[in-house]
């Protein structure tokens, strides 16, 4: 059978962009399907746009819930593309509909998983071990560091591997106060590890510190898939990009191998099909699971690559709870711009021993504050400030007094996979294209709830030690101590987990489907566990490792 392409990739975010980059460099003829539209931050970003230049003053829109200047088109709800949640459960699903996906507006916090994160069950008896070790993926973390560029500092911390770093920027004023406070409390506080360039790197200029990374960078100084991966892949002449292509199912032939992907052309509404020798899914953890579950046939009645029944299972998200406070030492400042990147300059990696605590996995702490450009709705909680709020001249004076005096601390921690957190096909609901949608089930265990309680206490202690006043009361057990709903941190992974045992996993150690040897997954789906680190750097490294393996298999004519 003749084929149109060597490889078909579904999804253009971190994993899909990396697969396109590596495979085109290796000589493969690749087609990339993206459900959203084209996006080029050099021309489409709202960077340096002032609020007064828009009638909305930067307020949220249906396509940009984080504000109309935000670099991500999509949101928690997309017209004509619903999802459902089981009764009594709490889960929110953020979906991007644009070239590059979520890499256009993410926080660029770029952390490697540590050795213990790949052997969690061995360490504490909970969750499962990965079929790979840190040593297996370390060379690919190194490659990602060298290609993309990341700033940070070499610290030698246990289970927080150092990388190949560019120099970090200096802490801003409020971050210096956080650092000094953490030093007194015995909390580790180090420079952030962020994929924003502080020096020219691989033909891309250094960041000029406008602080608007979330809008998309016109100078391409931060990491996004279109700017760093898809652009160079297009330059090879071996990548065909199809935007507005909503994947419906992975098609299979009589031998049980994947033959391509059926999709809807969203412009015309017509069904299309692209053929390829190899199919790589990178649509996001949940979208890829949905695609497999909807790819049913007589050979695969429960969905493609699902003989284990594990597709969609063991979803996790980063745990999250936040605390904000007002710091009197930062009040009444002369108006100024806090030079720096649009992300944190310092953060607090996990510093305690879980064996001495009542919860088994850790978290890190992220920091925000400073004099960022005001936008619509800024300081909307001023009525919570000491003597703040009111009307007229007094309100204006309060805005000036308190602007830049607030500091926020955010816990981002590890969730242990459980059998009650998963997605499945909703039997009664379809999207505007007639494709069955996902129904989510979610449960936080006592592990995560106790973790959130500990974090709330810790974050409040830091703000109090800074001499600040916390703005909200301590949450209690009725709200899981402030633990946000599943999906709200937008770090959902799992659903097509990797493993050595095909009875309990979907993919092997190279993210290759046990049941279909020419099918691979390179988004967050293969993750066996979450770790207390953000997932993007591991998605990139795993995708590079898998793509190298695909290239090798092609050379050996094994797929």
State the predicted function of each range.
Residues 37-62, 96-105:
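Conserved N-terminal glycine-rich FAD pyrophosphate-binding loop of Rossmann-like flavoproteins
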């Amino acid at each position: 059978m003749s084929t149109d392409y060597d490889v078909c990739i579904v999804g253009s975010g971190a994993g899909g962009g990396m697969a396109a980059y590596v495979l085109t460099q290796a000589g493969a003829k690749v087609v990339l399907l993206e459900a959203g539209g084209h996006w080029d931050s050099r021309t489409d970003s709202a960077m340096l746009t002032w609020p007064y230049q828009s009638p909305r003053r930067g307020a949220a829109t249906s396509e940009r819930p984080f504000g109309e200047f935000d670099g991500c088109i999509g949101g928690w709800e997309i017209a004509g593309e619903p999802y459902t949640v089981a009764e009594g459960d709490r889960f929110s699903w953020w979906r991007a509909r644009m070239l590059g996906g979520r890499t256009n507006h993410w926080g660029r916090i770029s952390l490697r998983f540590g050795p213990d994160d790949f052997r969690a069950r061995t360490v504490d008896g909970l969750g499962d071990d990965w079929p790979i070790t840190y040593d297996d993926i370390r060379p690919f973390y190194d490659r990602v560091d060298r290609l993309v560029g990341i700033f940070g500092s070499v610290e030698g911390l246990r289970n927080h591997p150092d990388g190949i770093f560019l120099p970090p920027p200096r802490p801003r004023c409020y971050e210096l106060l956080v650092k000094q406070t953490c030093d007194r409390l015995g909390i580790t506080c180090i420079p952030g590890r962020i994929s924003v360039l502080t020096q020219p790197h691989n033909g891309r200029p250094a960041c000029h510190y406008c602080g608007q990374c979330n809008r998309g960078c016109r100078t391409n100084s931060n990491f996004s898939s279109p700017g760093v991966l898809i652009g160079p892949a297009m330059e090879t002449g071996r990548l065909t990009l199809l935007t507005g292509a909503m994947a419906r199912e992975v098609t299979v032939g009589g031998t049980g191998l994947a033959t391509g992907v059926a999709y809807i052309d969203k412009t015309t509404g017509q069904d299309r099909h692209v053929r390829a020798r190899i199919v790589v899914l990178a649509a996001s953890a949940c979208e890829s699971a949905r695609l497999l579950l909807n790819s049913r046939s007589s050979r695969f009645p429960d969905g493609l690559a699902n003989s284990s029944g594990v597709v969609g299972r063991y979803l996790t998200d980063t745990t999250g709870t936040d605390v904000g406070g007002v710091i009197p030492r930062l009040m009444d400042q002369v108006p100024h711009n806090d030079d720096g990147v649009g992300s944190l300059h310092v953060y607090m990696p996990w510093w305690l021993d879980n064996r001495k605590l009542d919860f088994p996995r850790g978290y890190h702490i992220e920091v925000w504050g400073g004099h960022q450009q005001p936008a619509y709705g800024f300081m909307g909680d001023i009525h919570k400030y000491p003597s703040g709020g009111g009307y007229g001249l007094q309100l204006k004076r309060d805005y000036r007094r308190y602007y830049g005096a607030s500091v926020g601390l955010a816990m981002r921690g590890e969730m242990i996979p459980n059998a009650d957190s998963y997605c499945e096909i909703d039997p009664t609901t379809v999207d505007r294209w007639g494709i069955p949608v996902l129904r989510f089930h979610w449960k936080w265990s006592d592990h995560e709830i106790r973790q959130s309680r500990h974090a709330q206490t810790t974050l409040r202690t830091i703000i109090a030690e800074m001499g600040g006043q916390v703005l909200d009361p301590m949450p209690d057990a009725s709200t899981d101590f402030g633990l946000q709903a599943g999906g709200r941190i937008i770090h959902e992974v799992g659903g097509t987990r990797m493993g050595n045992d095909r009875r309990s996993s979907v993919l092997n150690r190279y993210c290759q489907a046990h049941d279909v040897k020419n099918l691979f997954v390179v988004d967050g789906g293969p993750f066996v566990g979450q770790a207390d680190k953000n997932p993007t750097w591991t998605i990139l490294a795993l995708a590079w490792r898998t793509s190298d393996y695909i290239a090798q298999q092609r050379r050996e004519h094994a797929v």
